[in-house]
């Protein structure tokens, strides 16, 4: 099982004082050194944390794949084609939200998403759709020719309900049946990571805010190593 580390909130801290530190590339590189299999960043339209220069610098210096989260807009598409990350993850975006509140509606936004997915894939960039854990959303992700789906697991991480966990497990199994790799992300901490890691067809977890918070107490290396240890042990014992 793989671990993706999202470093958006390293940039949030930097931007609060308009300083050059903390350095997003240095923190990302430390995360990789300590077990991160790929690095994720969300380049939002309002540039509230990650900025264009961060994305280009990460692509240049990282020894692991870069996963670029972005809205399905013309501006972001052109940036992605210039950066050429290994993967782009298409997400919904609202200016007033604190963080991404839900998955992208692959059915309702089909006509908007289709040309963006096609253009990215023709440019040699793999495409992931960040979706709710629902079979219909998986179906439309497949119709859009997405390479992967990432399940929005925020509802489970907040509620810890068995019903939400079953939704994730069912959507992951269905994604596998449809031939699409399945990741999970949003709101994950050590406890929820341990549980989600037992779901056979979830192949990677994306974790950001929690790991950055843990890093303030224990350091980046310790936080990332602990998370990687937990998910690998849970997967092995599942």
UniProtKB/Swiss-Prot annotation:
Enzyme class: transferase
EC number: 2.6.99.2
KW S-adenosyl-L-methionine (keyword) present: no
Gene Ontology MF term list: pyridoxine 5'-phosphate synthase activity
Pathway named in the protein's UniProt entry: Cofactor biosynthesis; pyridoxine 5'-phosphate biosynthesis; pyridoxine 5'-phosphate from D-erythrose 4-phosphate: step 5/5
Record: residues binding 3-amino-2-oxopropyl phosphate: 6, 17, 187, 208-209
BP GO annotations: pyridoxine biosynthetic process
Keyword tags: Cytoplasm, Pyridoxine biosynthesis, Transferase
Annotated Gene Ontology cellular component terms: cytosol
Record: active site: 42, 69, 186
Catalytic reactions on record: 3-amino-2-oxopropyl phosphate + 1-deoxy-D-xylulose 5-phosphate = pyridoxine 5'-phosphate + phosphate + 2 H2O + H(+)
Site (Transition state stabilizer): 150
Binding site for 1-deoxy-D-xylulose 5-phosphate: 8-9, 44, 49, 99
Pfam families registered for this protein in UniProt: PdxJ (PF03740)
Keyword Transferase: yes
Quaternary structure and interacting proteins, as annotated: Homooctamer; tetramer of dimers.
UniProt similarity note: Belongs to the PNP synthase family.
Role summary: Catalyzes the complicated ring closure reaction between the two acyclic compounds 1-deoxy-D-xylulose-5-phosphate (DXP) and 3-amino-2-oxopropyl phosphate (1-amino-acetone-3-phosphate or AAP) to form pyridoxine 5'-phosphate (PNP) and inorganic phosphate.
Matches recorded under NCBIfam families: pdxJ, PRK05265.1-3, PRK05265.1-5
Name of this protein: Pyridoxine 5'-phosphate synthase
Record organism: Anaplasma marginale (strain St. Maries)
Gene designation: pdxJ
């Amino acid at each position: 099982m793989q671990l993706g580390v999202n470093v958006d909130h390293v940039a949030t801290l930097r931007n609060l004082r308009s300083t050059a530190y903390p350095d997003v590339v240095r923190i990302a590189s430390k995360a990789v050194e300590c077990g991160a299999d790929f690095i994720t960043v969300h380049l939002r339209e309002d540039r509230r944390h990650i900025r264009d220069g961060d994305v280009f610098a990460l692509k240049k210096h990282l020894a692991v794949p870069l996963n670029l989260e972005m809205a399905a807009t013309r501006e972001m598409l052109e940036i992605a084609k210039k950066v050429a990350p290994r993967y782009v993850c298409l997400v919904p975006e609202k200016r007033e939200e604190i963080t991404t509140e839900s998955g992208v509606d692959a059915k309702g936004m089909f006509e908007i998403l289709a040309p963006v997915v096609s253009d990215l894939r023709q440019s040699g960039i793999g495409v992931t759709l960040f979706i709710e854990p629902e079979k219909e959303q998986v179906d439309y992700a497949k119709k859009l020719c997405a390479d992967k789906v990432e399940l929005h697991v925020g509802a489970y991480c907040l509620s810890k309900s068995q019903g939400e966990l079953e939704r994730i497990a069912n959507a992951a199994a269905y994604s596998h049946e449809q031939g699409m790799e399945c990741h999970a992300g949003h709101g994950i901490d050590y406890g929820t990571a341990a549980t989600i890691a037992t779901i056979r067809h979830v192949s990677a977890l994306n974790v950001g805010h929690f790991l950055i918070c843990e890093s303030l107490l224990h350091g980046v290396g310790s936080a990332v190593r602990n998370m990687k240890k937990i998910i690998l042990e849970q997967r092995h014992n599942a």
